[in-house]
């Protein structure tokens, strides 16, 4: 028979319990990826490249292709950035999926992780498919 103090000292199998929910988080991330690609498809089908729609006085939706990172950082770097940013997007997604597997973070953090995974992989799809992010 094990004493209460010995039972308390034994590590709990966190990964096994987290891996059950991990699939749920990955389904949500895949849904975010599908939503990302769906919205980009709607924009590409209905808004000519370079055109914009005023949503409010201070917010416009503009159809652009960004070969760089955020705010066109590295957009004119000569093409190597496409591959580097693709690898970075996949790497970040793998790290965040690993954190979800381990059960790291609060539920709010996990929702943020799946949003980041969905968006990062959406950008990876764009870079592989058309060489830039819509």
Enumerate the predicted regions with their spans.
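Alpha-helical transmembrane bundles and membrane-interface segments of multipass inner-membrane proteins
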Residues: 1-134
């Amino acid at each position: 028979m094990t004493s209460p103090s010995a039972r308390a000292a034994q590590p709990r199998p966190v990964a096994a319990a987290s891996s059950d929910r991990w699939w749920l988080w990955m389904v949500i991330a895949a849904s975010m990826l599908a939503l990302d690609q769906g919205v980009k498809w709607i924009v590409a089908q209905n808004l000519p490249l370079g055109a914009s729609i005023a949503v409010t006085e201070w917010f416009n939706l503009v159809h652009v292709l960004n070969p760089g990172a955020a705010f066109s950082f590295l957009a004119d770097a000569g093409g190597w950035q496409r591959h580097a940013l693709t690898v970075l997007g996949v790497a970040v997604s793998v790290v965040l999926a690993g954190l979800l597997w381990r059960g790291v973070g609060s539920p709010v953090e996990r929702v943020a992780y799946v949003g980041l995974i969905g968006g990062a992989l959406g950008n990876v799809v764009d870079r592989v498919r058309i060489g830039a992010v819509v």
